[in-house]
Amino acid sequence: MMVNIPVIENFLSNSCFLILFLTTVYYWLKIGFGGKSSFSFTGLTGYGSALCCLTLQLILRWVDSGHFPLSNLYESLIFLAWCLLLLYIYIEVSTKTLFLGVLTSPAILCLVAFTDFSLPTELQQSTPLVPALQSNWLVMHVTVMIASYAALLLGCFIAIAYLVLSKFFIKTTFVTAPLSSQNTVLRQESFLEEKQKTDIVFEKNDKNLKFLFFLDNLSYRTIGIGFCFLTLGILSGAIWANETWGNYWSWDPKETWAFITWLTFACYLHSRLVGGWTGSKPALVASFGFLVVWVCYLGVNLLGQGLHSYGFLNV
């Protein structure tokens, strides 16, 4: 009996979207109703199930096409979502914090929705590799580059979350009610009551500041990992370009924006390592980098120009 791979792929993609939607609702309801912000087995189960759906989808396309599924924009977006899910699962297991799921689950859900429901059907079909892509460097270069995009985007998104949350947390004021008195004698009950209120406020703000520090540090580490992958991806791409076209660098739009992306995050890391920046300043640089990564990944490819336009919109 013939296996209808497109039907199975459609089922897997729809299942992935539904699972991510339910997982997003779960995270928001858990936080909204005052649930614990610690490790969540249910949330991770949802993410793990979505990751399995994407993994099976990539394997099916690999078997059907005979090559690693990175020949067009649709397949690269699936792999990007796969990398984001894998990286997030690792972060949540390592940090044991639930609040990151509240921030990242809607972003990953939107990416999967765009991939499944916005791209034209023609672009979602498996296509043979053009001669320039028929190389062992395809897996090495493209997978590393997309993995770098995933790490950089997630790190930048956490930095943006830091900027938004800091507006609410840092501006919190410690306001306490005046102590009650009667005949200039301070009652012990009133003093204890007001002291308890003050301690609660300070404890809450101390937790908020610690969480902001956690986000700042997590963003820094995630972007650092992404920068290493980006550097490796650019170097492997240069070697592949020399083997294919006879020169290491041709300054086509994709290469130019990859270099701009590298410079942006090199400045970010330099400001932190050498300049000692922390908090809002590097988060602003990362926010700019968030846009740069999307231009490098999607914007240039949508133009359909340059040596890197293979397999994207010119199908």
Curated annotation (Swiss-Prot):
It is found in: Plastid, Chloroplast thylakoid membrane. GO terms for molecular function: heme binding. It is a multi-pass membrane protein. Keywords: Chloroplast, Cytochrome c-type biogenesis, Membrane, Plastid, Thylakoid, Transmembrane, Transmembrane helix. One of its GO terms (cellular component) is chloroplast thylakoid membrane. The chain crosses the membrane at residues 15-35, 39-59, 73-93, 97-117, 144-164, 222-242, 257-277, 283-303. It comes from the Eukaryota. Its main location: plastid. One of its GO terms (biological process) is cytochrome complex assembly. Pfam families: Cytochrom_C_asm. PANTHER family: CYTOCHROME B_B6 PROTEIN-RELATED, HEME EXPORTER PROTEIN C. Required during biogenesis of c-type cytochromes (cytochrome c6 and cytochrome f) at the step of heme attachment. Belongs to the CcmF/CycK/Ccl1/NrfE/CcsA family. May interact with Ccs1. This is Cytochrome c biogenesis protein CcsA. It comes from Chlorella vulgaris.
